[in-house]
Amino acid sequence: MVGQTEIPARPLEPALYLVATPIGNLADITLRALETLAAADIVACEDTRVSRVLLDRYGIRRRTTAYHEHNAGEAGPKLIAALQGGQSVALISDAGTPLVSDPGYRLVGEAIDHGIRVVPIPGPSAPLAALTASGLPSDAFLFAGFLPVKVGQRLTRLEALKAVPATLIFFESPRRLAESLGAMVEALGGERKAAIGRELTKTFEEMRTGTLRALADHYAAADTPKGEIVVCVGPAEAKADEPADIDRLLLSLAAEMPASKAASEAAKMTGGQKQALYRRLLELKDTSGEGDGG
């Protein structure tokens, strides 16, 4: 029941339903999600105790079972068998969208392999909530989950992500936040723009923005923060092409087309000015003794 409205428990087709749940504020759930949870034969939960709070809040009484990283090998086949037997299964995580930093992808893969329909029921997502409030570029982003605990492995992972032309999104624990931010400064550079989302959608929600170095300094000096944390790091700035690289590009293009068109194409590819590139190409051709090719 939502307010005075009874949630209809309409029969569901046999399928695996991936139901997004609130990341903090229990009001952040869709009507479709509630209808699905109210009608599913089985609700598979990361932690049944955590999920019971949500289900009780909306008066949903359905059979629940645990499905998490430590029992996936045993619980997965049982859920597949239930699906093959004509039952509907709703998969939920403790918070947010299933499969985002949890083992649900294994169950989805098994369902697909067995020809079972998989239905996404979209809704809350902590990485997307943080990204949209960060002020960082959102046209391209990469969710990297939790960084490794060991220092060496953490730096190796960050080095691998250094040149990715997208906003990076991480989950982090409060006790490791300061250390991880320090590693990001070392591996990614301290001047990158970043944002820290903490306790998103909850009473003490906080979004703190600044450079990586400023944020690292802040959390190194502050008490250990509380709550769930999402770290967003802006993409690396595109480096200007080296003059030698531009020269090689101009000569390569000029070998296939007139100089004016080569300069025009080079301008499109590098963001440079066509006239300046044209003059540079003529200089290169004069030096090589080729003269003006038009």
Curated annotation (Swiss-Prot):
Catalytic activity, EC: 2.1.1.198
Identification of the protein by name: Ribosomal RNA small subunit methyltransferase I
GO CC, one annotated term: cytoplasm
CDD domains: RsmI
Keywords tagged on the record: Cytoplasm, Methyltransferase, rRNA processing, S-adenosyl-L-methionine, Transferase
Catalytic activity: cytidine(1402) in 16S rRNA + S-adenosyl-L-methionine = 2'-O-methylcytidine(1402) in 16S rRNA + S-adenosyl-L-homocysteine + H(+)
Family of this protein: Belongs to the methyltransferase superfamily. RsmI family.
Lineage: Bacteria, Pseudomonadati, Pseudomonadota, Alphaproteobacteria, Hyphomicrobiales
Molecular function as annotated in GO: rRNA (cytosine-2'-O-)-methyltransferase activity
Record HAMAP family: 16SrRNA_methyltr_I
Protein's UniProt keywords contain S-adenosyl-L-methionine: yes
Organism of provenance: Mesorhizobium japonicum (strain LMG 29417 / CECT 9101 / MAFF 303099) (Mesorhizobium loti (strain MAFF 303099))
Function, as annotated: Catalyzes the 2'-O-methylation of the ribose of cytidine 1402 (C1402) in 16S rRNA.
KW Glycosyltransferase (keyword) present: no
Chief localisation class: cytoplasm
Subcellular location: Cytoplasm
Root EC class: transferase
Pfam families attached to this UniProt entry: RsmI_C (PF23016), TP_methylase (PF00590)
Designated gene of the protein: rsmI
